[in-house]
A protein has these predicted regions:
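A short His-aromatic
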Residues: 14-15
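A short acidic, Gly/Pro-enriched loop at the edge of an enzyme's catalytic core
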Residues: 1-6
Length: 156
């Protein structure tokens, strides 16, 4: 009961397999009337291309692609970075496969697992923990189409 705000931004909520446990913790941490702000996406239509890999920047190339673009490639001074987003919507799991290829030939690979239930399921988990949904902010003006900030409060 000591925090006024908890921010859960940039896909953090999707790293939690047990989201109800996360929301239960947040409700304990927040003071009455405190805010929980959670960044969520429409898992089937958000643009998984990382911003530095998007040549159009302000406009999503997804609008013009016949199929959803899930791969990113970025060339930095010392290494090349590639990533691919794979969604298994039947199991509510996505993987984000990353590869860093350095000039000396060394390669680093990593895979992040995201537990991506649809947004209504996540909102219901927050409400089951006692949160009140106050609103949803569309991030389209920040060039993040199909991405949102959900604003929850702990009851007084």
């Amino acid at each position: 009961n000591s925090l006024t705000h908890v921010l859960c931004l940039y896909f953090t909520v999707y790293f939690f397999k047990d989201k109800r446990h996360f929301f239960d913790n947040c409700i304990e941490w927040l003071m009455p009337g405190g805010y929980l702000i959670v960044h969520m996406v429409d898992r089937e239509s958000f643009d998984p291309i990382l911003p530095p890999g998007n040549p159009l920047y302000v406009v999503s190339p997804q609008k013009y692609a016949k199929e959803r673009i899930t791969k990113t490639k970025i060339v930095f001074n010392d290494f090349e970075y590639t990533a691919n987003f794979n969604l298994d919507k039947e199991n509510d799991i996505a993987t984000f496969d990353e590869k860093f290829k350095f000039e000396d030939g060394k390669v680093r690979k990593q895979q992040q697992t995201l537990y991506m239930e649809d947004t209504s399921t996540i909102v219901n988990a927050a409400q089951d923990s006692g949160f009140i949904l106050q609103g949803k902010i569309d991030l389209v003006k920040c060039a993040y189409e199909n991405q949102y900030l959900y604003l929850f409060t702990k009851p007084n």
